[in-house]
């Protein structure tokens, strides 16, 4: 049985656009890239270089944000587990009101 080859493409996540600093950095970067393209002797090469560098930057940013989100979820899960254990160890209905 032949296995189909699967191509995985990275898609730009719109989550970083929720941060004003990121949007302003993108705007400044685009303006600089536009200026460089206008002055370049070989705009196609400059464009592909800028595109690959920008893609790498966005991939790294996306990876960092996902890592931070996973860390927050892990801490919240641990906190919830501790609260759940304390709830089960408490005796009586009056003690359960605290939780």
Swiss-Prot record:
A motif (RxLR-dEER) lies at residues 35-55. It comes from the Eukaryota. It is found in: Secreted; Host nucleus; Host cytoplasm. Its main location: secreted. Keywords: Host cytoplasm, Host nucleus, Secreted, Signal, Virulence. GO terms for cellular component: extracellular region; host cell cytoplasm; host cell nucleus. Secreted effector that completely suppresses the host cell death induced by cell death-inducing proteins. The RxLR-dEER motif acts to carry the protein into the host cell cytoplasm through binding to cell surface phosphatidylinositol-3-phosphate. Belongs to the RxLR effector family. This is Secreted RxLR effector protein 94. It comes from Plasmopara viticola (Downy mildew of grapevine).
């Amino acid at each position: 049985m032949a296995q189909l080859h699967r191509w995985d493409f990275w898609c730009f996540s719109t989550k970083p656009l929720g941060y004003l600093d990121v949007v302003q950095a993108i705007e400044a970067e685009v303006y600089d890239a536009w200026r460089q393209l206008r002055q370049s002797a070989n705009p196609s090469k400059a464009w592909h270089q800028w595109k690959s560098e920008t893609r790498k930057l966005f991939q790294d940013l996306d990876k960092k944000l996902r890592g931070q989100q996973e860390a927050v979820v892990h801490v919240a899960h641990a906190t919830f587990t501790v609260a759940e254990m304390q709830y089960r160890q408490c005796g009586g209905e009056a003690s359960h009101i605290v939780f």
